[in-house]
A protein has these predicted regions:
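ATP-dependent NMP and nucleoside kinases share a basic, alpha-helical "lid"
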Residues: 87-125
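Hydrophobic positions on the alpha1 helix immediately C-terminal to the Walker A/P-loop
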Residues: 19
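Conserved nucleotide-sensing/catalytic segment adjacent to the nucleotide-binding pocket
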Residues: 35-38, 43-89
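NTP-dependent small-molecule kinase module
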Residues: 120-125, 146-195
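P-loop (Walker A) phosphate-binding loop of NTP-binding proteins
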Residues: 11
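Conserved lysine of the Walker
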Residues: 16
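Post-Walker A helix-loop "phosphate-sensing" segment adjacent to the P-loop in P-loop NTPases
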Residues: 25-35
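Extreme N-terminal, non-catalytic leader segments
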Residues: 1-6
Length: 195
């Protein structure tokens, strides 16, 4: 069986990392070798200090993540032995990377208010100030997502859209299993029942 990539996309703070980890664990329970790959592992070191908000937003969108390297790594991996292994790629703006043909896309949706609340909680735990976090949200994360959604329309292209406003009760908004092989569909069902 061929190797597969499944992409878990969504706003910053939508619960992608948590959902992707649950999906990888469920795939393993279905007998697959599953690994997580985070778009955050492909960040470029960029100094945002002193930039005007519009310049900061543009730099974040255009240069912060090395999407070409993501695409190269996935292509090389997907061309490996037909062992049925799965990579669960999670992160923001994933359609900017060149994903292997047939990659199912799962998009997690949350309100801007809930995303902001989660980002604040996450980043305060990392020692950032509320002011610094609000600046990142307003100058990088949300403007980049607006631009990404206008350019790539992930909601229209998604195989699965999940309302993840409540982590404990994710709700399927739309689902097409056409590109979800049975083990992936079963793993997704397991995650949706368990969350």
């Amino acid at each position: 069986m061929a190797r597969r990539v499944v992409a878990v996309d969504g706003l910053d703070g939508s619960g992608k990392s948590r959902f992707a980890a649950s999906l990888a664990a469920a795939l393993t329970a279905e007998g697959r070798t599953a690994s997580l790959l985070h778009i955050d592992d492909f960040r470029r070191p960029i100094d945002f200090s002193g930039l005007a908000p519009q310049a900061e937003s543009a730099l974040y969108y255009e240069r912060y993540f090395d999407f070409a390297s993501v695409g190269d790594a996935l292509s090389t991996w997907a061309d490996g032995p037909a062992d049925g292994a799965v990579i669960v790629l999670e992160g923001v703006m994933l359609l900017r990377a060149v994903l292997p043909p047939g990659t199912p896309l799962i998009v997690l949706e949350v309100s801007a208010a809930e995303a902001r609340r989660r980002i604040l909680a996450r980043d305060e735990a990392k020692g950032r100030t509320p002011e610094e976090i609000a600046g990142r949200i307003d100058r990088r994360y949300f403007p980049a997502q607006t631009r990404y959604r206008a350019a790539c329309d992930p909601l229209a292209l998604a195989d699965v859209v999940i309302d993840n406003e409540d982590w404990a009760k994710p709700q399927v908004v739309r689902r097409s299993d056409l590109r979800l092989p049975p083990p992936l569909a079963a793993a997704l069902d397991r995650v949706l029942r368990a969350e």
